[in-house]
Amino acid sequence: MKLMKKTLSLMLCLIIALSVGSTALAVDVPASWQNKWADYSKNIAPAVTMFPGSDETERYIAWYSSSDEGYVELTAKGETKKFTATATDVPDGSYRLGAVITDLTADTYAYTCHSGDFVSDKYEFTVDATDKVTALYISDIHMAIEDENENALIERSYIYNETLNAALKNADDGLDIILSGGDQASQGLTEELIALSSPELMKTIPFAPTVGNHDRKSIGYKYYTFLPNQADLAFKSYIGTDYWVRYGDALFLMFDSCNTSMMGHYKFAKAATKANEDATWVIAVMHHDMFGGREPWLNSENTLLRILWTPLFDQYGVDMCLYGHSHYYSVSDVIYNNKTKVDLEDKNEITDPAGTVYLSTGSVNNFAPLLDDDGNVPPVGELAAFTYLEEEEPLYTLLDFTDDALTVNSYTVDDSENIYSLTISKSDKDGGHTFRNTKWYMRGFTYFVSVIVNIINNSDMYNRYKDQGFDVSLYEGLIGS
């Protein structure tokens, strides 16, 4: 308990210092957000966050606590239910509590989190009665503590809050789920993730993150997240794994692309699609860009990732893959077997495409350069159908799902400019997919290569986490230490 109080005191001092420092804000943060941030930082420990359950009938609620016991109190139509939380030990001596709210129906609910002397604010959310599902896609949020900018967290959390609010305002029927393509936190620190939870919408709309390479720089993500249907991979990242979520007609496959052990990813995709055979839309969400281009120094890595991942998407009929990492916005052609199946240049509507569309979005906070070191526009990927260079402005993408159409619209935050639109229609559940089964020898080669790469990655993470003083026994079996 003493360690817990000391840790929270240090974190509180850090956040307050970052929020009231004398350095001028690089971003014009209004007084309303500065006041909200000051109030939020006074009660830093909980970081209440709503994550998705298996489907719309569930919500996963998580928060930090000095107590290992707690519950969520849910109210609707005058009736109150309590959902007991389970506790996970956090290395700093605190706990991350998680409660699963079940049996939700179309209605408006209010909930509060309780643990020890802590009682959260009351948060209200709605379960939609319509069949239409609207998902918000963003990536590379990059909450960050910066040595050169003591106001970084307040500025970045404000920009993130504005991005969420802009998306909600532009969503005709509200937002059902927030999909994030990784790199939520620049250093993977708990303080950064606490800032991530500061927007009100992080407590009222389910947040579905994926693991990014920056999230792996420390272990905050491992304890911050509370997610359903997690894959038990033989080779997995220390901080997370694959999981799936089903909303309406859409199945979201949330992949940890930092983990290149493809045998586990194939096993996960097979189980998830089998459990959701009636889903019309299969959407993959991962971190690493494969087709956008713009960063020539990543060509070798992207080629390897395409060899590893695209056969899986072909085999399981993935309609769209959402990713980030490059911080550049791009949309590919319809791709099958790593080749263009349908050229999407100047097309905004397609029916029954036999392949996958890959969409990479820009960063919420870390904007990619418009020109390279030689003053040239960075080259796009050869299979990219549309690209957009953002001038230090966050983007977001809304995906609307019905039983026969997926409509994609991407916008700028500041002026809500619609930079890209695409509608994919299906005449039946399978559309044009042929579900190519990878040849056994190619799959064996892929498994072999992916395991070697994964061992190298795990070795790097093993050394990083060991230096930080964390328990690395999991890795010792994976790298033969």
Predicted regions and their residues:
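Acidic, histidine-bearing metal-coordination/catalytic regions of metal-dependent phosphoesterases
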Residues: 24-148, 392, 402-481
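Acidic/histidine-rich helix-loop elements
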Residues: 85-88, 95-96, 136-162, 218, ...
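Extended active-site neighborhood of metal-dependent phosphoesterases/phosphodiesterases
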Residues: 99-100, 108-127, 191-278, 282, ...
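An acidic-aromatic substrate-binding cleft motif
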Residues: 118-181, 187
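Active-site neighborhood of phospho(di)ester-bond hydrolases with catalytic His/Asp-centered motifs
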Residues: 137-139, 177-183, 187, 207-213, ...
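Active-site environment of divalent metal-dependent phosphoester hydrolases
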Residues: 143-147, 185-191, 213-219, 260-263, ...
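Active-site-proximal segments of metal-dependent phosphoesterases and phosphodiesterases across multiple
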Residues: 152, 158, 279-321, 333
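Core catalytic region of metal-dependent phosphoesterases/phosphodiesterases
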Residues: 156-218, 315
